[in-house]
A protein has these predicted regions:
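Loop-to-helix entry and N-terminal half of a specific, functionally important transmembrane alpha helix
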Residues: 224-240
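Charge-rich, low-complexity intrinsically disordered segments
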Residues: 340-342
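Hydrophobic alpha-helical transmembrane segments of polytopic membrane proteins
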Residues: 235-251
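Polar-ligand-bearing catalytic/cofactor-coordination segments
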Residues: 1-223, 248-334, 350-356
Length: 356
């Protein structure tokens, strides 16, 4: 079995554990409240975050040290992992503080919205911080906007477009600087910017996550006299809600990839076809022939499917929502935000998972 299939299996097990954990916590909420009623909220949240890090650690180690891609381990993994953990812990601590501050009068949606906006605003700084290596600004052909070249030791890092309202800045691996395919990839990203797919994805994902928070709140899933337990329940419910996103969103992401490919095919068809095949190799995602597996677990369609779909595509697209939600869901305390096969044990990809 190749690395891609092993990583897929690892991700499925990892997601399954967080899903079962979250369902169990919500199912035994009353018993948990009785057991921990005398413990302070700060201690509960601190123990919960620390526990989530410990549970996830074996998966991170296997993903980084055993199931690495292209025959080369990430030699900066430990430093990047610590910085990634610091970043996520800071985000979750901020969300918890805002809930302490605002929830009694304003509910859970406002603290979540503020946290999501801050996560979006700091995406660029977080990427540079977690990567822990050199970067520089550059001008690239076919992309009108700010470009950052990042010297990244994670070989499956592809960068992408930064979140933002009307934003047109991108980040690329420094290893692509001399690539003959950089021009066509920049053209693809320009198509994404021109069609406002980043903005569409941003609005859709904010709506999706706030809808999940609101449903949980109206159903009383978070209610507890101990605000710490309320935050734990919020985290568990949003982990379940994010699982629905993992199952439903890849199909919508496919339509965006097909449409961008369709428009880019008019620019340089031969180069695009070569790049599609090369890109699949770079991100180390096998062309799984099982259609159900493709539609659920792979937001980026197989190289063969992309090439076969170049002549026609739907223009009704939400953007690359599936994997972008992995990063955005930091703002809703999603325990599985770094448990998918594409980013397990790859700290920089916790912020920028591969997308096309």
């Amino acid at each position: 079995m190749n690395t891609a299939k092993l990583r897929l299996s690892l991700g499925q097990v990892n997601i399954g554990i967080w899903l079962l954990f979250s369902i169990s916590v919500l199912s035994f909420k009353k018993e948990i409240e009785m057991s921990f009623s005398g413990i302070g909220s700060v201690y509960i949240i601190s123990a919960f975050i620390l526990g989530s890090i410990i549970i996830q650690l074996p998966f991170d180690i296997i993903g980084a040290q055993k199931l690495y891609s292209h025959g080369q381990k990430n030699n900066k993994w430990i430093r990047q992992w610590f910085r990634g953990i610091i970043s996520i812990t800071t985000c979750w601590s901020l969300l918890s503080f805002l809930i302490f501050l605002l929830q009694p009068k304003l509910g859970f949606c406002l603290p979540v919205l503020i946290t999501i906006i801050l996560v979006i605003s700091f995406q660029k700084k977080l990427t540079i911080f977690v990567n822990a290596d050199k970067y520089n600004y550059c001008d690239l052909q076919n992309f009108k906007g700010q470009s950052i070249s990042l010297n990244c030791s994670e070989r499956t890092f592809t960068g992408g477009l930064f979140f933002g309202f009307g934003n047109n800045s991108q980040i690329i691996p420094d290893s692509w600087s001399g690539s003959s395919y950089l021009e066509i990839e920049c053209f693809r990203r320009s198509v994404i910017v021109k069609n406002k797919f980043v903005t569409r994805a941003l609005f859709f994902l904010i709506f999706w996550n706030l809808l999940g928070v609101l449903i949980g709140e109206t159903q009383g899933l978070y209610y507890s006299d101990n605000i710490g337990i309320s935050i734990v329940c919020l985290s568990c419910w949003m982990t379940i809600w994010s699982f629905f996103a993992l199952i439903l969103m890849p199909k919508f992401s496919h339509s965006t990839v097909y449409y961008v490919d369709f428009l880019s095919n008019k620019y340089d068809s031969d180069k695009l076809k070569e790049w599609i095949k090369k890109f699949s190799e770079l991100i180390d995602e096998s062309d799984n022939k099982n259609r159900l597996v493709q539609s659920i677990f792979y937001p980026i369609p197989s190289a063969n499917d992309r090439i076969n779909a170049l002549k026609s595509a739907s223009s009704f697209c939400f953007g690359n929502i599936s994997r972008q939600n992995l990063f955005l869901s930091w703002g809703v305390f999603n325990l599985s935000c770094r448990s998918v096969h594409c980013n397990i044990g790859r700290p920089v990809l916790w912020i920028f998972p591969p997308s096309a």
